[in-house]
């Protein structure tokens, strides 16, 4: 109930960001930031297990500030402004998913300001995305139109097969 997912509109190549992080590995500030991100992941897990969601949100912000120090390619002025405006609207913290550089921004906010944060992010050009937790792990679909029979649909599930005539 407290997480928002916002598409930043930025397209990026993750490999370039990761290469830059590897290059920066030997720099003290970038290395310290990597260590902080790792420590924060453990701290966030502990806060979630304790049910302390407010602290979890604040730790997300610490993590984002640390991640940005790992490479100058992780963020850009548009992403920073989107993030900062979400914080001003009441979000406690957030992060770009994946390597950074664009894609989706995940924000944690108290439920009573969630709609205010979402509205502000949309005003700033972000695109809010609907999402749900998937308890079965990552799911993917592949559609091969050449093999598709438009007269019937068959679904294979662990507990049985289903066939639908169209």
Spans of model-derived segments:
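C-terminal nucleotide
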Residues: 1-94, 106-166
């Amino acid at each position: 109930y407290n997480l928002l997912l916002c598409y930043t509109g930025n397209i990026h190549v993750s490999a370039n960001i990761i290469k830059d992080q590897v290059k920066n590995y030997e720099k003290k500030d970038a290395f310290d930031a990597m260590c902080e991100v790792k420590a924060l992941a453990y701290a966030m897990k502990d806060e979630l297990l304790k049910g302390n969601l407010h602290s979890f949100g604040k730790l997300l912000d610490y993590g984002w500030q640390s991640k940005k120090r790992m490479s100058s390619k992780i963020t850009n002025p548009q992403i920073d402004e989107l993030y900062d405006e979400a914080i001003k609207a009441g979000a406690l913290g957030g992060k770009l998913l994946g390597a950074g550089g664009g894609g989706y921004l995940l924000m944690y906010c108290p439920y009573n300001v969630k709609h205010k944060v979402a509205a502000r992010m949309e005003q700033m050009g972000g695109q809010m995305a609907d999402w749900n937790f998937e308890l079965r792990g990552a799911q993917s679909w592949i559609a091969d139109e050449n093999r598709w029979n438009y007269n019937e649909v068959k679904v294979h599930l662990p507990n049985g097969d289903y066939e639908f005539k169209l």
